[in-house]
């Protein structure tokens, strides 16, 4: 049961509905109706500009980002769709903190709302490192439909795996 793997933790009725959509071949149509908008953020520089725009809109006082880009190896190696890293770099007698956000290349072709959701998730890690209540509250502040988009992302991943 593919839905159980991606939707673990959701109510059994919801898992059954998602699995039925998949088995009936209606999952792609359902997602196309829910998430019709596509995006043009295809390059690392466009992604950096997109992330910076969201960051200045919602997290003005957060530390600057040194790198934002797509990462082709991300999903395979770390079983993650996006990462945020903080690395300390020695420059002479000073320590400098580098902050990076990497997004799986899967999102180059994903609907715009799903890209926005993963970027919001990684930006929230600039303030809150752990996945706790303040973290999700911040995500919801930046993207009011965050929890619905997270569920839609899980459905999208199910559909993508089925296409392989």
Where are each of the predicted segments found?
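Walker B beta-strand of ABC/ABC-like P-loop ATPase nucleotide-binding domains
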Residues: 119
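Walker B catalytic acidic pair
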Residues: 122
